[in-house]
Amino acid sequence: MKYTEFEIISKYFKRNQKKDVNEIKGIGDDSALIKIPKNNILAISTDTLVEGTHFLKNISPEDLGYKTVAVNLSDLAAMGAEPKWTTLSITMPESNNIWLKKFSSSFFKILNKYNVRLIGGDTNRGSLSITLSMYGLLKKQIALLRSNANIGDLIYVTGTLGESAAGLFLLKKNIFIKNVNIRNYLIKKHLNPIPRVSEGMALRKIANAAIDLSDGLIADLDHILNDSQCGANINLNKIPISKVLIDNFQSQNYLNWALNVGEDYELCFTISKKNIDKLKIIKKKFLVNFTCIGYITPIEQGFNLFDNQKKIIFKKKGFNHFD
């Protein structure tokens, strides 16, 4: 049995989620109505995921439902915003009830984990693509902007880098690894990234600039440098690489994955040296590591990578939709 557009919305996407006090009208009308609390501003992020470009054709509906939400949460995390609401638009070749049930179940599972409510959306027929808009709140004057880095700031990243790219290459069979547990771990890092929402909210009062690492460290950090009109010195030996990658792959592979491939969805942020003691206190609250990889310099000095004090020549590349 195939459902109509409105039957799909009613059956799979109209859930009895915990209501938000600022939500006047949610899903089910021509538009949602939201009240913005006093002294707050609204952070808005939108991502479109297209089959064959952002996810492989054989991805499970459960993994796609999770990742659709996770990558948008990561954008809000980079601003220091608290995620509150979302809208979803799905274009798909046909009304597949089994697919919709699995997708929506995973989709709402991660929404509920982060206390986010679905307040609207749309369904259409066509090649599989998903567009999600995420809305979050934060107090005025404390957003983590890409343009706020200052000369002398230290540059930090959360977690480890390169594992998502390794998982992608395993899925595409560009590399092979015998250990099934390690293989599954890396693939999960690609399909089920952890958005650093709590970390972003904790950093918003002490960090200066931030970005989530979706396109690779070099490309994403370069956005901060361009917007802040600064340069940077990065030490390759300080980039956090997991023992899993070091033990199972060559260094040129995992460094390239960390620098250029992306989809780690960790946070890269800059912070003044005077706030390092505050950062140490924050670090104790989280299981994830915070690693200093370099510092911000005057724009005239450019963007530099060093390997044991030896300057490395590199190209500023990363994921680009139109390459």
Swiss-Prot record:
Protein name from the UniProt record: Thiamine-monophosphate kinase
Pfam families: AIRS, AIRS_C
Pathway: Cofactor biosynthesis; thiamine diphosphate biosynthesis; thiamine diphosphate from thiamine phosphate: step 1/1
The entry's keywords: ATP-binding, Kinase, Magnesium, Metal-binding, Nucleotide-binding, Thiamine biosynthesis, Transferase
Binding site for Mg(2+) 1: T46, D47, D122
Record-listed substrate binding positions: H54, E263, F319
Catalyzed reactions per annotation: thiamine phosphate + ATP = thiamine diphosphate + ADP
S-S bonds: none
Upper taxonomic lineage: Bacteria, Pseudomonadati, Pseudomonadota, Gammaproteobacteria, Enterobacterales
Binding site for Mg(2+) 5: D215
Family: Belongs to the thiamine-monophosphate kinase family.
